Curated annotation (Swiss-Prot):
Keywords: ATP-binding, Cell inner membrane, Cell membrane, Membrane, Nucleotide-binding, Translocase, Transport. The keyword Cell membrane applies. Residues 1-237 form the ABC transporter domain. This is Putative ABC transporter ATP-binding protein GSU3001. It comes from the Bacteria. Gene3D superfamilies: P-loop containing nucleotide triphosphate hydrolases. InterPro entries: AAA+_ATPase, ABC_transporter-like_ATP-bd, ABC_transporter-like_CS, ABC_transpr_CbiO/EcfA_su, Co_trans_ATP-bd, ECF_ABC_transporter_ATP-bd, P-loop_NTPase. The keyword Membrane applies. ATP binds at residues 36-43. Its EC number is 7.-.-.-. It comes from Geobacter sulfurreducens (strain ATCC 51573 / DSM 12127 / PCA).
Amino acid sequence: MRFSVDLKAYAYPDGTVALSDIRFQVARGEFCGILGSNGSGKTTLLKIMDGLIREYDGSVLLDGRDVRSLQPKDIYRTVGLVFQNPDDQLFAHTVFEDVAFGPRNMGFAEAEVKARVERALEAVDLAGAAAKQIHHLSYGQKKRACIAGLLAMGHEVLLMDEPTAGLDPMGEYRMMELLTRLNRQEGVTIVMATHSVDLVPLFLHRLYILSRGRIVRGGPPEEVFTAPAEMESVKLRLPHIAELIHRLKHEDGVPFRRTPLTIGEARREIMELMETTRS
């Protein structure tokens, strides 16, 4: 599935303009990020792409068709939104019942429902958790259960609202690993809204910076993270790895304590190591 967003303006009911001049595309099989601070409009943008918000000036095309011209059931068979708080999405008593709700509602036979649930739970590393009660899951497991519910319905596109929010550093990394695996191995197109900058350059194909309802920068992460001053102007910072690379390229080096190397020697060693890693 391919998204083409040309959003001229969206305003809240009180007239406050939330989004304006938003233009970007998401290709089939792409892992795309929308990076912005809290209140920048990320969640609102995802809801527009999912068809939950339909009153706006502009267009959002899904495979060339305006999402507002599609019936909700037609959108939800292919595109799924995962909310930031999994408790807003999970409702059943057990993991199986929650993940099975979508396929059952689509009319699949019970044997097919069971097979879809098993495949989906295995895909999100929750195999064997079908009988668990939802409230016994950890926060990270709940997020995975939400993803499983959409995979069981056969969704080709996942819109993820802050998927790493509320997770510890290891949980954040594992979530990004999961999404990357779904994208690279299963071919799921993913659009991820986030305010976390450090994991972004490691996984995404393309990144857009959203500030005050406008996209101010976009492209591959390695191109986006080349302007520290511009990042600071939108209340964001460079990822630690990008900051290190920037300092190595544009300053005298990065000082390290307790090292037998001079700053210049350390700089050369690190740059050589980075080149070796790339090759």
